[in-house]
């Protein structure tokens, strides 16, 4: 007897999801070998391939479903029955949370993101794991105290096998023990404790991370050991037990971790314990499930919307030439809409802007570029849109809007973590805050450049300050690869009057960049000039940028750590 069409379609979607996630895990599993072999180019290529997997599989699944439906076509009634059949299949799927998101993506793709009915989507989770799912199979647990910690650490490091030996395991054990004894929570001196470590290693860039927590007397502290490779051996770079630093390590401005997680929801439950203030969607993003992170973000947004009463407003700061940005004051996210026409002198197309955002999604963000999510036909309650914001959107992006009696629907937008624009931060900062922010700003530009990203527009308004005081770039319409730039020094004037001319006395090609000119628009305030020239003088010299380009061209991958240099054991030992 032939299966009902809805049953066949539901089973096909689930099979295609399982095929996608199997390939996702296969790419992830290669991380250990890439780390052991210092295959840093392979790390980048694998990251890009894994990000592209989801859309590829959703597209192929959508095409197959349309073929299966044939003359029946995809009606809302049929898709409602498909969802019912899919829900019946979910109990057999361990990774049902991400499977729901995959179903949503296929449904939206079939209807080209139009005439979407919430009841045919998994707006709310269909299944729940309960508040306290069993995590024991994921963990190694070590019960110890500060006196016996060295023996525990020796066992712990031995439990994680690599083909490379430790450079000096005993030295690393001494460093971890010393650092925890001198700087760790005081309660570790007073009580025995348990260290719970995830069995699976987290890989990102040049690092491998053992990720876990310390549990003592009802309190929980992070316990993260970053491992680095010399090419011949590995070593522990530091120990992280500070909640703020753990949150930065699993940050929204970094490349996604590669961690073998057949059931990512269980990893999220565990990580939530050491980062209770980080929303689930950011944790899903961090472990590479960014498409399900998008689902979780939407659910988080809906929940916040229901619990708040204020209106969406234009975001603080200087208005962008390419984007109109707005936010809900109590919500930690901004919404960015591409304008219909760009403010001169911007000379890019809509498709070029979207291509830049795709580039950022697939590139190593080195902790300095905010992650984004892209939405189509995003709905807002009309009565929650302030009159000023509605007038602004009608003026700058009318083609992106559909307005009904009770809804504002925006055809296309990006979401991004809310930060304080650096220019606004500097306006209110004292001398110490200014110095730290400018140090961060210069470091952000240098680290992006070392990762082959030139920001293009380096004005302070295009950078944000996070709650942890880090400076992150968030305006992508002018970014390009460093290797595409032609850094030049300004030629000397031919005649004295050249310096007073409104036009340059030298030819300028489209990709020509003159770092000396950065000072003109960045260093207008004497205090800023003084600090920048102390900390980042080389940024204004074309030779510095050419040197970075040379490193990139010969395959030098710079070390970028998600913690300050003084946190590294090597630095503490005077190395």
Curated annotation (Swiss-Prot):
* Active site: residue positions: 371
Cellular component GO terms, alphabetical = cytoplasm
Compartmental location = Cytoplasm
Q: What is its EC number?
A: 2.7.11.5, 3.1.3.-
Where's it mainly located?
cytoplasm
Reaction catalysis annotation: L-seryl-[isocitrate dehydrogenase] + ATP = O-phospho-L-seryl-[isocitrate dehydrogenase] + ADP + H(+)
Question: Is ATP-binding included in the keywords of this UniProt record?
Answer: yes
Pfam families, per this entry? AceK_kinase, AceK_regulatory
Molecular function (GO) terms for this protein are: [isocitrate dehydrogenase (NADP+)] kinase activity; AMP binding; ATP binding; phosphoprotein phosphatase activity; protein serine/threonine kinase activity
Q: What are the protein's UniProt keywords?
A: ATP-binding, Cytoplasm, Glyoxylate bypass, Hydrolase, Kinase, Nucleotide-binding, Protein phosphatase, Serine/threonine-protein kinase, Transferase, Tricarboxylic acid cycle
GO:BP terms for this protein? glucose metabolic process; glyoxylate cycle; tricarboxylic acid cycle
InterPro entries per UniProt = AceK_kinase (IPR046855), AceK_regulatory (IPR046854), Isocitrate_DH_AceK (IPR010452)
Specify which residues bind ATP according to the UniProt entry for this protein: 315-321, 336
Name the protein family. Answer: Belongs to the AceK family.
Function summary: Bifunctional enzyme which can phosphorylate or dephosphorylate isocitrate dehydrogenase (IDH) on a specific serine residue. This is a regulatory mechanism which enables bacteria to bypass the Krebs cycle via the glyoxylate shunt in response to the source of carbon. When bacteria are grown on glucose, IDH is fully active and unphosphorylated, but when grown on acetate or ethanol, the activity of IDH declines drastically concomitant with its phosphorylation.
Return the protein name: Isocitrate dehydrogenase kinase/phosphatase
The record lists the lineage as: Bacteria, Pseudomonadati, Pseudomonadota, Gammaproteobacteria, Aeromonadales
Gene symbol?
aceK
